[in-house]
């Protein structure tokens, strides 16, 4: 019985266990996690009947019992296996679900990682397939930098949906933008490629073929976009070199359009900042667009306008990029390296220009012997770009900003006031037709390009601005002064003139006269001689002809030359006024006094021709007298301006000199409150001006000193203050030793520097008061106001003036 009981017990137990396990096996199958419970039940079954367990193990051996036991065992095994299989299946299903999620996300991440590799591979393949391999490679490089960041960012945000949405959207964008920009295509192809990373090879081959075809078809357009985007993003000299090459490969129209778009972007960016600073900057921001439009139209008109348009875009590249970069540099001085490579681009673009100009010259020859003007432009443009580079290196940011703005505004004014067509009619008819549009565009882009050199044209414009646009000059002087700030503000009224001269040092100063003469009267002589000679001989040659031809322009030149001091003060602001007075005064007083007297003679010619300009200067003189104490510190720089003002207002000069001699010590005591504040600026600004002027101006002063006799001779007849000028020269020669001469020179210097200082405060006030009045009153009314201002400022500025003047006198 025991035996029977024993087997029954295990059978019954086995059945019970089987049933038990069988019933829960269903929910266990449903609930895959209950496998552990089943195993526990196995353990429980074995534990509950310990004896039957042994019998069960023994029963496995016997046959009859082994059936049940074997079945039960198999059932147990099957149940466990089924449970495990169900678990695996469910887990597999879950894994599949998760694989779509997590696995795809991981794969997508890997794809993103591969995207860079794929892009690199594509770049190599595209470089092979694409006609322009370096362009394709660079293009691929750009998207590699951008799209992976986007994909990685969105991959971090959303594992699957973000990337897939990107991929789908990218495919759509790809379809939409393939024809538009090759860069977007690269982005879309790169993104779409990770979309199907498993099929990378296929997709890679496909987009490569697409890229090749696209490059072949729209290579120019694609290259354009890439060039424009690459420069602002990377600002790499390598990319710039490629850009120049791309521009060369790209048709002239496209190249011009590229340069236009690129510069419009930069200029628009820079112009808004300037527009924020001044309405004049707004006009400049508008003008570059207008010029770009004008250039685009000439680019379309390859025959007549294209050479200047081509010349402009490349030159404008160098210049605009330089100027905008300069403008941006003062703002965000980071882009400096880009400016240098851009300058490097300028010669490359010049070569491209030469080629394009040669082609355009052929078309122009067909049009009407316009190749001459083009050659003149080429010579001027070619000669100028290096000058622009040098000048930009010397005084890039500060000079270019006011020059670009003023030159642009002046260009508009020149179009209105000066018949550029007439001026260029003297030049080949090519400029005559394109005169207004391209003359403005050429003058401005060059001004933007060479800002110093063709800032000479811009100066040419500023002198006309002095003549016809003295109103604009007043308004611009106010706005540029607001742009530049108090330190630059005084120079800005003169900056329009001095910026180019400062940038070009003396030849640039001379260049404006010739460019003035060139664009205004002798367009042919101006651009060729003015641009080529300005660096070398123009000071002497240009000024005499400019005095003979256009005393106003020449007057503008002396002003511009005088203003270099103002312009220099901008850069030179950091330099202490005392140091400047120490080492600069001798050079400045000696040279500027000798040179600028002639200039002032020319300036006197200006007063005669441009009463408004003398009025401004007279108002500036009033301010100068008021700030003469300060100018005593800045004697060096003011000596240049002072002779001009003294010559402008001989009566005032006598009065000013007498007042200076009599009240010079009080004037030294009298730095006007405005000048006191402005002096601090001017001291720093003028100190920098003095150093820069000593560096920059002394050569122009030497050349101008040579020119001054010629200029003096023609102007002496017109200029009453010429006797004062020799006195000034004597003071300039003995500026510091003789107290009287030093006072006169210091007064003159003060007057010149005060035009900077007082030009900031009083010139603005006087611009507000005299803008309408100066034009009507002329220089005579200004002396009255100047004397009144002198008296007022003398009384107000005694304390500060004495301190500063004493320091400078001690230093000098």
Swiss-Prot record:
Region annotation (Disordered) ranges: 1-66, 269-333, 367-388, 424-547, 672-741
Functional description taken from the UniProt entry: May be involved in the later stages of fibrous sheath biogenesis. Binds calcium.
Compositional bias ranges of the Pro residues kind: 488-501
A GO molecular-function annotation: calcium ion binding
Positions of post-translational Phosphoserine modification: 25, 57, 125, 133, 184, 273
Positions with biased composition (Low complexity): 275-286, 502-513
Example of a GO cellular component annotation carried by this entry: sperm principal piece
Source lineage: Eukaryota, Metazoa, Chordata, Craniata, Vertebrata
Major localisation: other
Subunit structure: Interacts with CABYR.
One GO term of the biological process aspect: negative regulation of protein sumoylation
Record's compositionally biased regions (Acidic residues): 514-528
Keywords for this protein: Calcium, Cell projection, Cilium, Flagellum, Phosphoprotein
Compartments it resides in: Cell projection, Cilium, Flagellum
Keyword Iron attributed: no
Full protein name: Fibrous sheath CABYR-binding protein
UniProt entry tagged with the keyword Signal: no
